[in-house]
Curated annotation (Swiss-Prot):
Top-level taxonomy: Viruses, Riboviria, Pararnavirae, Artverviricota, Revtraviricetes
Keywords (A to Z) from UniProt: Coiled coil, Host cell junction, Transport, Viral movement protein
Entry annotated with the keyword Coiled coil: yes
Protein name per Swiss-Prot or TrEMBL: Movement protein
Coiled coil: 292-322
Record's GO cellular component terms: host cell plasmodesma
Description of how the protein assembles with itself and partners: Homotrimer, through the coiled-coil domain. Interacts with VAP.
Length: 323
């Protein structure tokens, strides 16, 4: 008589406005944490305001109605995702990239949100990406590695750089953190290319094809919102390296451009009969949710696996300023 053991574990749990979800199989481990802003301090919306009464001369009753009509609640879902995967030696030459955030992952998140709120969510705010490389060979081998996180939607290679690092796996590990600090529409055609991780391992002769040379583990902090103006970022730097890794590696920030001087040419095309940019809610409806992405719930499995992700919530305080 023999018994079989499942090689894949998947579970999810919703507690009020908090949701955790994980998956583990022979290819690696992934976990997600989503928290609605009602579970955190309310983030005030500032910086974009027009006082209607300063534009229109309105009776007091109409002023009140106008303000009521234009009240808008910030819908914010803070998310932390972590994934781990082994990399084959054949994929370390810098010719492939790893997408760190995908539309499929976002679809999975949106399926857990109440439909009345989900229909409003239109933006993703990218807060932080922490990347850890762990060697799958003994310590003491000189193994230089180059890494870059790029926004591959941007055509110019220099402009696409979010952060780069050079390190060595002689001590077994290397880690750095990039802070993108920008938002984009969920309708962006190439959203999957926004956070593209590229790596180049110098010792391509260390192993043969089929052997796994190192493990990539990454942690992403982001927020799903209904507005581009919902989030303020805490970090001032664009990239950081842990103090312990500074002796064996270095980092490079994305360069800030020299602003071109304003010229005297104000010529632009203001002719009539231009095409209108489409507005309205129809664009959001185009973001189709795949119902097949819903998974079965099993609270017993959650209890046995929750220890692997119980610290993810604490990561939020390192990414967003909730003061």
């Amino acid at each position: 008589m023999c018994s079989t053991r499942k090689t894949s574990v998947m579970d999810e749990k919703v507690i009020e406005n908090e949701e955790i979800h994980f998956q583990e199989n022979s290819n690696g481990f992934s976990a997600d944490l989503t928290i609605h802003q009602d579970k955190l301090k309310q983030i005030s919306k500032t910086g974009l305001n027009l006082e209607k009464e300063h534009i229109f001369n309105m009776p007091s009753s109409l002023t009140k109605a106008f303000k009521t009509a234009f009240k808008r609640k910030n819908e914010i879902f803070y998310c932390v995702s972590t994934k781990e995967m082994s990399v084959d030696i054949k994929d370390v030459s810098g010719q492939v990239y790893l997408p760190l955030i995908t539309k499929q992952e976002i679809q999975q998140k949106l399926m857990k949100i109440d439909p009345s709120v989900r229909s409003k969510i239109s933006m993703i705010h990218l807060g932080a990406v922490k990347i850890l490389l762990t060697a799958q060979f003994r310590q003491g081998i000189d193994t230089s590695v180059k890494m870059a996180l790029i926004d591959d939607r941007i055509v110019n290679r220099k402009d696409s750089l979010l952060g780069a690092a050079r390190g060595n796996l002689a001590y077994g590990k290397f880690m750095f953190t990039v802070y993108p600090k920008f938002a984009l529409s969920l309708q962006s055609k190439n959203l999957d290319k926004t956070l593209s991780f590229i790596h180049q391992f110098e010792r391509k002769d260390l192993m043969k094809t089929g052997d796994k040379v190192f493990t990539v583990t990454y942690l992403i902090g982001y927020a799903l919102t209904n507005s581009h103006h919902s989030i303020e970022y805490r970090k001032n730097s664009n990239i950081e390296i842990e103090e312990v890794f500074k002796d064996i590696g270095q980092i490079e920030e994305s360069p800030f451009c020299d602003i071109s001087p304003i010229d005297e040419n104000w010529t632009m095309d203001i002719a009539r009969n231009k095409k209108s940019i489409a507005t309205g809610s129809s664009s959001r409806r185009n973001f189709r949710i795949d119902e097949s992405l819903l998974e079965n719930k099993d609270e017993n499995l959650l209890r046995s696996m929750s220890t692997k992700i119980d610290t993810l919530g604490k990561k939020l305080s390192l990414i967003y300023d909730n003061e």
